[in-house]
Amino acid sequence: FNCDYSEGAHERILKKLMETNLEQTPGYGEDHYCGEAASIIRNLCKREDADVHFLVGGTQANMTVIASALRPHQGVVGAVSAHINVHETGSIEAAGHKVLALASEDGKISASQVETLYLEHIHDESFEHMVQPKMVYISNPTELGTIYTRAELEALYGVCRRYGLYLFVDGA
């Protein structure tokens, strides 16, 4: 498996596409399929008042979420191998948000790495002139195929809560 953009579709998806191929529906997320999917998402999130928007790809989704969540002086922390750092054509940085890449041998970053980066930032005498870490981005599974354990996820979440950082969990 390389990525979802380069693989074929499951036969049930192809069957459903063939069944609905000639349906005429409005575009831009205004069709009944998107309406049903949005309703399911709201229900699962237990937020009937939530806005749900569908985007055409992962890069666009990542860029939209990150650009919406961060202020211009804030950046996103991730593994050096994270696809927002390596494969998304610089879209995050093109939107004005630096990717603060942490070294990783297995594609995972640790809570202690994030905490160290954050504390080094706030204790730097010129921190106000530096990109502020505000979001932690992880891929699960990672780009290298490794999976975070529940304990690792809870530790990352704990550090994010402690320091007011957003935690963004994506899939590779």
Label each residue range with its predicted role.
Residues 1, 41, 61, 92, ...:
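Buried hydrophobic positions in well-ordered alpha/beta secondary-structure cores of metabolic enzymes
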Residues 9-58, 80-85, 91:
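Conserved N-terminal alpha-helix of the aminotransferase class I/II PLP-enzyme fold
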Residues 49-70, 100-107:
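Conserved core of the PLP fold type I
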Residues 68-86, 115:
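Conserved PLP-anchoring active-site segment centered on the Schiff-base-forming lysine
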Residues 70, 93, 157, 161:
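Anion (oxyanion) recognition and catalysis
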Residues 76, 99-100, 167-169:
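Hydrophobic beta-strand scaffold residues
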Residues 96-143, 147-155:
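PLP-dependent aminotransferase-class I/II
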Residues 148-172:
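Catalytic PLP-binding core of fold-type I/II PLP enzymes
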